[in-house]
Regions:
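Flexible, solvent-exposed loop/hinge segments and secondary-structure transition points
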Residues: 1-42, 46, 54-57, 70, ...
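Sterically constrained small-residue positions within well-ordered secondary structures
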Residues: 9-11, 65-67, 76-78
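Compact, glycine-rich, soluble single-domain proteins
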Residues: 35-73, 97, 101-111, 116
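Intrinsic-disorder/low-complexity peptide segments enriched for small residues
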Residues: 81, 128-129
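A short interface-forming secondary-structure element
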Residues: 87-97, 101
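Conserved small/polar residues in nucleotide/adenosyl-binding loops
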Residues: 122-128
């Protein structure tokens, strides 16, 4: 068991995008739109959480390589019933950044869920997360 040897692989431009969503109550959606969550601005805090998770992926997942992250973009979309998060990560390296994008989406949505529990704890559905 160990980390895969990527030392002989060429350095290439790598990009990965992951997306996910949590289903929320109308009260939770309204608190996001109006910026009135008891814990603060949901999208702002969750963006920070997503970026931090991207950067810390190898600390959380021991078989992931520490990768120099060149760019990380976090986007949010609010619909009538869901909060969507999309994280895109870019680098020039010997291995991809799929796990970093997935970790970013996961942490961003979990942070949002944590921040919205006081608003509507029983009407939250945990994230659906996809690598796109």
């Amino acid at each position: 068991m160990g980390i895969v040897d990527v030392g002989s692989k060429p350095i290439l431009e790598r990009e990965a995008t992951a997306t996910g969503a949590i289903r929320l109550s109308k009260e939770a959606i309204d608190s996001i739109i109006n910026g009135k969550s008891p814990k603060g601005d949901v999208r702002e805090a969750s963006t920070i959480s997503a970026i931090q998770a991207v950067k810390e992926t190898p600390r959380t997942l021991p078989h992931c390589h520490p990768i120099p992250i060149e760019a990380c973009n976090v986007e949010w979309e609010v619909t009538e019933e869901e909060l969507h998060c999309t994280v895109t990560v870019r680098t020039h390296w010997t291995t991809g950044v799929e796990m970093e994008a997935l970790c970013g989406v996961s942490a961003g949505l979990l942070c949002a869920w944590d921040m919205l529990k006081p608003v509507s704890y029983t009407h939250l559905t945990l994230p659906t997360i996809l690598l796109v």
